[in-house]
Swiss-Prot record:
Renumbered residue ranges of the record's region Acidic: 173-187
Gene name for this UniProt entry: gE
First-listed, main subcellular location of the protein, grouped into a coarse class: virion
Name used for this protein in its record: Envelope glycoprotein E
Transmembrane stretches, start-end: 111-131
Motif (Internalization motif): 154-157
Lineage: Viruses, Duplodnaviria, Heunggongvirae, Peploviricota, Herviviricetes
Length: 255
């Protein structure tokens, strides 16, 4: 076990110097009253039945004055040789002194380079964030179209033909209107308008027609106009009062 030296009563130190004494725990060794001549390397071997089981060593120094070790961590200058043959003479190298100006210049260059790298990375990061925000806004923007409510819409070809003038009345007076006397109930005979002139096939209205009151639009007609297809469901004519007589009277009054 780990306590076998303390239980082994036959442990012998053998031929040992007088300044080496066993410790009270019978495991360690103590150096006591060491003379100046005892300086050297000591090797300790543990024997068990004449066979070595373990060993260790220690270096003992009895110098009255110890010198501190000088550690030089600076780089040697160009052309300096520390180990020079001086005829078996001990040469102690002296540490090179780094000037404050050289160290300050190197530090400034390093800090400037580091600052440039940081500024470049920050600018790239800001540009990336702005670009991402623009893409996000564009993706969420809904396209729309502004419609002009005042756009001109033509439902028919304009013309200045007096035969095309038709009065349309959206709302007329009722049959009980008192603005007409009893004699106005008689139907007024109006002359029929002259028939429209038949245009030749594929003829056009030239500038001469425009001088006679035409609008100037050129209209082409087919030789044999195609018949309109029969509607599937014919609309039923609305059933209501006939205002044709009233419209004729109003038209005669307006003329």
């Amino acid at each position: 076990g780990s306590t076998w030296p303390s239980r082994c009563h036959s442990t012998l130190l053998g031929d040992r110097p007088h300044f080496i004494q066993p410790a009270p725990n019978r495991v360690d060794l103590l150096f006591k009253d060491i003379p100046e001549s005892a300086t050297g390397l000591y090797v300790f071997v543990l024997l068990y039945n004449g066979h070595p089981e373990a060993w260790t060593y220690t270096l003992l120094s009895t110098a009255n004055h110890f010198m501190n070790v000088l550690t030089d961590r600076t780089r040697p200058r160009l052309g300096e040789h520390f180990y020079t043959d001086h005829g078996h003479q001990l040469f102690t190298p002296h540490p090179s002194e780094a000037t404050t100006q050289e160290l300050g210049a190197w530090t400034r260059h390093y800090l400037a380079f580091l600052l440039i790298i940081i500024c470049t990375c920050a600018a790239l990061l800001i540009a990336l964030v702005v670009w991402g925000c623009i893409l996000y806004i564009r993706s969420n923007r809904k396209p729309y179209e502004v419609l002009n409510p005042f756009e001109t819409v033509y439902t028919s070809v304009p013309s200045n033909d007096p035969t095309d003038e038709v009065l349309v009345f959206e709302r007329l007076a009722s049959d009980s209107d008192d603005s007409f006397d009893s004699s106005s109930d008689e139907e007024l005979e109006l002359p029929q308008p002259p028939p429209a002139a038949q245009l030749q096939p594929y003829s056009s209205l030239e500038s001469a027609d425009a001088s006679r009151g035409r609008s100037g639009f050129k209209v082409w007609f087919r030789d044999t106009p195609e018949a309109s297809p029969e509607p599937l469901h014919r609309p039923t004519p609305p059933v209501g009062p006939d205002y044709s007589k009233v419209a004729s009277k109003l038209r005669s009054i307006l003329k």
